[in-house]
């Protein structure tokens, strides 16, 4: 098994970071083309990345402003059963330490290596959105 882990600070409080990482509206600002679902334990999320990429995930951890996790239930075979999540910790008065993970990959294959890079890019876009209010159109995100 292989995992992707990123840890970084965002200059805003945990409630805003949690909203960006755990709600369909928040995810659409930095990761998905569109998302649907109820942000609650056991709910199903629909994650859309274009016509050939309509994926699904189940919320397996939901602790407001603290932690969130999705288990992929319909996705690329390498992503099936993997878990995407974050743990948040206040850092100072107006910052949040984010521990992001995408765990349970079958191996550190080519897709895993590409996804490591893509997650870093997407998380950077999320941080820019939260800290500066910048919104990057979906089609331009991997070039931002």
Please report, for each region that a protein language model flagged, where it lies by residue.
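Glycine-centered tight beta-turn/hairpin loop motif at sheet-sheet or coil-to-beta transitions
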Residues: 1, 50-52, 77-79
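Hydrophobic ligand-binding cavity/cleft-lining segments
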Residues: 1-36
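Intrinsic-disorder/low-complexity, polar/charged segments enriched in Ser/Thr/Lys/Arg/Asp/Glu/Gln
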Residues: 3-7, 44, 54, 67, ...
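Hydrophobic/aromatic beta-strand elements that line small-molecule binding cavities or substrate pockets
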Residues: 8, 56-61, 82-90
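Hydrophobic pocket/interface hotspot
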Residues: 17-21, 27, 45, 59, ...
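Glycine-rich portal/gate segments that line the openings of hydrophobic small-molecule binding cavities
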Residues: 28-29, 34-74
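Short, highly charged C-terminal tails/helix-capping segments
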Residues: 128-144
